[in-house]
Amino acid sequence: MDEDGLPLMGSGIDLTKVPAIQQKRTVAFLNQFVVHTVQFLNRFSTVCEEKLADLSLRIQQIETTLNILDAKLSSIPGLDDVTVEVSPLNVTSVTNGAHPEATSEQPQQNSTQDSGLQESEVSAENILTVAKDPRYARYLKMVQVGVPVMAIRNKMISEGLDPDLLERPDAPVPDGESEKTVEESSDSESSFSD
């Protein structure tokens, strides 16, 4: 034995003289374990089911709200054929503000920009910009009205349009689309001029 009174080699108990474990007690312990485990799993599944039901309800509410918003937007008269005019002065002031370190070269740049601006105005008449395109103009109008931008971007993606063009209304319409729109607009104008 060591200083704590424990045997050094084995337990020192003759196992042939130890009584057997009572079976009723073992069965009671197993039953208690099974009952507690089943109760825990039932509570867990109930909580999960409630949370899933709450999420499902919230998703349905969001879907309903989105449908109502879509219906309200489609009921606004004139939203389909709205064009937004962007003045070229805003564009030049933005470009001048972007280069504050080049103040000594500004007079030369202004004269260059004025001539470049006149050339771009001539070419702008031939190029269809995003602001003048009726497909994009209605989305730009939605932004001005105050519709959430993410909802507009999702709607544009669902219709196959580029949502990044919302931030660049003076950009030209992507290739292939401008020719179609020019033909469609000329067809629609000629149909009204009998």
Curated annotation (Swiss-Prot):
It comes from the Eukaryota. Keywords: Acetylation, Coiled coil, Endosome, Protein transport, Transport. Residues 93-121, 159-194 are annotated as: Disordered. The modification N-acetylmethionine is found at M1. The keyword Transport applies. It is found in: Early endosome. Its main location: other. Component of the WASH core complex also described as WASH regulatory complex (SHRC) composed of WASH (WASHC1, WASH2P or WASH3P), WASHC2 (WASHC2A or WASHC2C), WASHC3, WASHC4 and WASHC5. The WASH core complex associates via WASHC2 with the F-actin-capping protein dimer (formed by CAPZA1, CAPZA2 or CAPZA3 and CAPZB) in a transient or substoichiometric manner which was initially described as WASH complex. This is WASH complex subunit 3. It comes from Homo sapiens (Human).
